[in-house]
C-alpha cells in the first residue's frame, strides 16, 4: 500500500490562527485554506481549528456547538462550534468572546498594537488543539496527527509532550521564523506549563517564554515552507536566534514548498482582468498592460518595461533597495506599479516618488485584491527583492500570469524561480531573473538583464510561457505532507 493510500486513513487536525476567507492577514491565511482542501482531496480526514474572531463567527454563523471546553489552569472556558469552510473542509471554531471577540485583527488592535493578552489567546488555541489530538479530546473525533502553524499554535506540541494522555504526533510548520511569540516567563503558570519545562531545554528563551521555541523543541517534526528556507534557518544569518536548536533537530527538519490556488489565480478565467489570456493567446496580455497604465495614470508606453510590486512595505521585503535604485531605474525605459502598505516611512517615501514622477511611478498604499490581480497581469515583470522570503506566493502568481519575476536568491524564491540563461530558456527551466546581493546595484543589474531579454520579443515570450507551464498547485505539496504524516504515525507506533 503506498503512502498516500495509508494517509487516507488518517485524521489530521490543522490548527491555525487564520484561514481565508474567514480571517487573513497574509500568506498563512491562504495556505490554511488551500492545503487542508488539497489534503482532503487525497482522502485524508482533515479538520481546521481556528479562533472565533468576529469575522469567523459571522462567516460560520450556522455552525453548531459540539463541545464545551472547561476552564483549565488560568485559561478561560470556551465552546467548540463545527461548521464548514467554503472548500467543504470541516472547521472547528474556538468560541471564547473574552479573548477573540474584538474589533481589531487576529493579533493586533485597530492601532496596530499587539493585544496584551496574546499569550492567553493563543495559549488557549494551542491547549485545545493538543486536547483534540489526545485521549482528552472533548469530541469523539480525535486527531491522529496534529499539524500546527507558526507561533500562535506552537505551544500545542509542548502540551502533548508534557502530560496529555494518548498524545498524537505533532509537527510545526515555520512560515516565518522571525515571529516567535515571546512573552514574560511568569505567564507560564496561567498557561499550565509545568516548572520542568521552564528551562533552555524547553520553552524558556533568554529569560522569557517563546511559543515558537516550544514548538521547535517539542514537535515530532518541523517543516519549513521551502527547501532553501529549511537550510537557511539553520544558519546565523537567517536563524533568528533559533539556529542552534534547529541544528540539533536537523534530522527532524524538512522543507516543503507551498502551493497556490490555481483556480483563483488563472489569467484565462480571472474576472478582474480587462482581457483574459493563456499561454496560447499571450498577445492578449498586452491590453491588460495598457489598462493598468491608464488606471494608475502611467504614460501609455508599450515599450517600457512595466515592473509590478504587490508587497508589504517592510525592511524584510527589500523596499529600501528599490527606493535607492530608483534614480538608476528611471534612467532606463522602466515604469513601476506598486501596491502595498506597512511601515509609515516607506509609505510616505513611495507617495513622494510617485508624486514626483506620476508618468513613471504609481504607488497605491493599502491592499486591493482586484488591483493585485491586475498588476500581476498588466506588469511585464514582477519585482521581489526580499532580504529573506520563507516561501513567497507572488512570484508563483506572476509566473502563472506570464509575468517573469525579478527576485533575490533567497528562501522559496530560489526554489520556485528558474534563473535566466539561454540554455535554461530553451530547456524550459528559465522563468525569471535572480540576483544574489541585497543591494540596489544588484537589483539594477537584474533589471538590466530583464531589459535585454525584453528587447527580444521571441525570447521574452518563451520566458513567459516557461513560467506559465510550471505547476504550482497544492497537489504535489499535499502529497509530501501526507507521506510525512504516514512516517510520523509509523514512528509513533514503533
Swiss-Prot record:
A single GO molecular-function term is: alpha-1,4-glucan glucosyltransferase (UDP-glucose donor) activity
EC number(s) stated in the UniProt entry for this protein: 2.4.1.21
Listed NCBIfam families:
glgA, PRK00654.1-2
Q: Where does ADP-alpha-D-glucose bind?
A: 24
Pfam families the record matches: Glyco_transf_5, Glycos_transf_1
This protein's UniProt keywords: Glycogen biosynthesis, Glycosyltransferase, Transferase
| Name of the featured protein | Glycogen synthase
Protein's GO biological process: glycogen biosynthetic process
Q: In which pathway does it act?
A: Glycan biosynthesis; glycogen biosynthesis
User: Which family does the UniProt entry place this protein in?
Assistant: Belongs to the glycosyltransferase 1 family. Bacterial/plant glycogen synthase subfamily.
Query: Gene that codes for this?
Result: glgA
Function, as annotated: Synthesizes alpha-1,4-glucan chains using ADP-glucose.
The protein's enzyme class: transferase
Question: Lineage in the entry?
Answer: Bacteria, Pseudomonadati, Pseudomonadota, Betaproteobacteria, Rhodocyclales
**Reaction it catalyzes:** [(1->4)-alpha-D-glucosyl](n) + ADP-alpha-D-glucose = [(1->4)-alpha-D-glucosyl](n+1) + ADP + H(+)
Amino acid at each position: 500500500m503506498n503512502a498516500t493510500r495509508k494517509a487516507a486513513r488518517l485524521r489530521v487536525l490543522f490548527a491555525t490562527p487564520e484561514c481565508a476567507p474567514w480571517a487573513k492577514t497574509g500568506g498563512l491565511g491562504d495556505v490554511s485554506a488551500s492545503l487542508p482542501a488539497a489534503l482532503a482531496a487525497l482522502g485524508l480526514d482533515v479538520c481546521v481549528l481556528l479562533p472565533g474572531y468576529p469575522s469567523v463567527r459571522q462567516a460560520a454563523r450556522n455552525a453548531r456547538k459540539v463541545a464545551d471546553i472547561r476552564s483549565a489552569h488560568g485559561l478561560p472556558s470556551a465552546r467548540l462550534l463545527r461548521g464548514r469552510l467554503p472548500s467543504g473542509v470541516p472547521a472547528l471554531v474556538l468560541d471564547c468572546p473574552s479573548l477573540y471577540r474584538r474589533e481589531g485583527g487576529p493579533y493586533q488592535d485597530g492601532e496596530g498594537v499587539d493585544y496584551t493578552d496574546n499569550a492567553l489567546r493563543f495559549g488557549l488555541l494551542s491547549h485545545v488543539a493538543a486536547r483534540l489530538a489526545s485521549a482528552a479530546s472533548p469530541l469523539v473525533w480525535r486527531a491522529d496527527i496534529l499539524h500546527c502553524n507558526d507561533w500562535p499554535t506552537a505551544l500545542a506540541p509542548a502540551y502533548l509532550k508534557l502530560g496529555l494522555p494518548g498524545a498524537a504526533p505533532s509537527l510545526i510548520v515555520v512560515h516565518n521564523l522571525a515571529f516567535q511569540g515571546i512573552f514574560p516567563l511568569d505567564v507560564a503558570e496561567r498557561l499550565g506549563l509545568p516548572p520542568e519545562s521552564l528551562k533552555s531545554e524547553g520553552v524558556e528563551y533568554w529569560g522569557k517564554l517563546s511559543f515558537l521555541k516550544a514548538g521547535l523543541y517539542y514537535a515530532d517534526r518541523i517543516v519549513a515552507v521551502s527547501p532553501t528556507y529549511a537550510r537557511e534557518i539553520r544558519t546565523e544569518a537567517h536563524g533568528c536566534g533559533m539556529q542552534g536548536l534547529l541544528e540539533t533537530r536537523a534530522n527532524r527538519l524538512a522543507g516543503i514548498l507551498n502551493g497556490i490556488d490555481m483556480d483563483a489565480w488563472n489569467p484565462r478565467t480571472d474576472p478582474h482582468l480587462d482581457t483574459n489570456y493563456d499561454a496560447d493567446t499571450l498577445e492578449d496580455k498586452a491590453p491588460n498592460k495598457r489598462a493598468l497604465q491608464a488606471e494608475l495614470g502611467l504614460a501609455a508606453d508599450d515599450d517600457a518595461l512595466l515592473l509590478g510590486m504587490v508587497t508589504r512595505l517592510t525592511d524584510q521585503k527589500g523596499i529600501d533597495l528599490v527606493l535607492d535604485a530608483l534614480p538608476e531605474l528611471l534612467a532606463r525605459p522602466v515604469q513601476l506599479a506598486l501596491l502595498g502598505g506597512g511601515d509609515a516611512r516607506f509609505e510616505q517615501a513611495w507617495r513622494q516618488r510617485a508624486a514626483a514622477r506620476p508618468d513613471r511611478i504609481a504607488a497605491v498604499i493599502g491592499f486591493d485584491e482586484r488591483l493585485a490581480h491586475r498588476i500581476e497581469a498588466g506588469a511585464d515583470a514582477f519585482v521581489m527583492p526580499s532580504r529573506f522570503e520563507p516561501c513567497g506566493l507572488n512570484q508563483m502568481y506572476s509566473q502563472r500570469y506570464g509575468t517573469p519575476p525579478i527576485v533575490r536568491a533567497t528562501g522559496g524564491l530560489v526554489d520556485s524561480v528558474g534563473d535566466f540563461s539561454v540554455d535554461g530558456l530553451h530547456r524550459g527551466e528559465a522563468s525569471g531573473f535572480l540576483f544574489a546581493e541585497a543591494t540596489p546595484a544588484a537589483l539594477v543589474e537584474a533589471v538590466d538583464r530583464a531589459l535585454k531579454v525584453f528587447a527580444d520579443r521571441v525570447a521574452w515570450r518563451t520566458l513567459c510561457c516557461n513560467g506559465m507551464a510550471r505547476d504550482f498547485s497544492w497537489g504535489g505539496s499535499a502529497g509530501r505532507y501526507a507521506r510525512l504524516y504516514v512516517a510520523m504515525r509509523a514512528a509513533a507506533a514503533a
